[in-house]
């Protein structure tokens, strides 16, 4: 197993060299999906504001609606990143724990011989 880097390109995320590219791809995928969802929500919000919800729509109402939409999408995006980092931390800590226990068991096996 390659050596574990204690600080990857994301702070406090332990990643191996092989996993760095995949980690970047996952974060970019999450960011892309979040951007697409934000665009869909914003594009769906504007016609409702202009035609049905607030008629006639003032610029203040449009700005408030867009800022609320943006803040909700940022909260979901940050939650996805934090969740991904914590899951990867758990995964890597379990992997290193398994490797340490296997090394210990091999050592005790060699001692018994």
Curated annotation (Swiss-Prot):
UniProtKB keywords: Plasmid
Source taxon at top rank: Bacteria
Name assigned to this protein: Protein TrbJ
Gene name for this UniProt entry: trbJ
